[in-house]
């Protein structure tokens, strides 16, 4: 009798289990699976070291230089021009551009190569025996810039002359200090033709080129970024002075200190009085403000954009306090909440402006307040309530709109975002910092921008431990989804 009861109970349990399974609603799960965007096979394999827009094309490097049409839907193609190396042992580790006519490609230990966009300035045959490097670039370690390109030369590599840059030989063994030498590249310099830019002969005494020498405290201080009137290293923000008497001490072993020879000579830069927790990890400027990224915070400092003055030091709040809640620091620094931050970028569109902070798992965003200035010219753009630490806090005006947040979580949000690139479409873009609380779709810029600008393209260089998903990703505004390029 007992055995019969147990059998009946087991049968009832099985029936109930089957009933529960058949009555559960799985439509949400299946809908999510069916709506998942298929991940593309990458056009560019491997890690991405740089991406720039030049004219109507985009250029990227994974060790080789690639290109594609800016507004096209085609795939990336290797640059086959003889102006850049294709040898496997010569890897292009950084790229830069003047924005229109040429791209610079740096192979550390070899030099800087120039590729002319759309064949401008090329020979009638379009070929040469072998690519050649730009004058005086043999010691360059990287190139940078998207409108005013430059290359970086470490201190102590002045054996072949200073090429019109002024004093060289920084970083001698007799001193614990060293210099960072930044070569400013004028249009049309170098050996590979002028790409239609005019000028020529980079490094000659008749050239309009010049060098910036930054005296650093020790060899641990590394270059990060530069722009109009400022240079950022892993330890300091340096700003241009306009008066040589206020400049830094000459580079050790440097002799002339720059400015006495060559065209334009050395510009004098000094440390801004602002202090940041170090190391500084990344920086970006929108032309009005500097944004400095550290492990825990983002700092904002007002940038002097007066072209007549050589840019005075960035201004800090009076009597700065270590407490972020202090009224003197309000709006000038904020905790970003991103794990293992790696990079910083600015995204602007139709009156909205966001800071994007790449980290070990996707990126975070900070919505910037409308342009405002407090006492002493400080910025008041960073607000804790505008720090969006998770996609659930994103809005429809966000770089990745709220409706696409879940798709982001399952793709780019799972991996390290090592670099973020914001690329404006040709024919329109919001180039000035502007406010606008609601960020309506067709809002006009308060600074006189066009009323309906094209949304910039958003790219991310993703790194993943197994390399399965490592590479270049893009937010596709047509499908409103992230996918590999």
Swiss-Prot record:
Residues 308-327 have a biased composition (Low complexity). Residues 1-23 form the signal peptide. GO terms for cellular component: plasma membrane. The keyword Cell membrane applies. Keywords: Cell membrane, Lipoprotein, Membrane, Palmitate, Signal. The keyword Phosphoprotein does not apply. Residues 308-331 are annotated as: Disordered. This is Uncharacterized lipoprotein TP_0136. It comes from the Bacteria. It is a lipid-anchor. A lipid is attached at residue 24 (N-palmitoyl cysteine). A lipid is attached at residue 24 (S-diacylglycerol cysteine). Its main location: membrane. It is found in: Cell membrane. Belongs to the TP013X lipoprotein family.
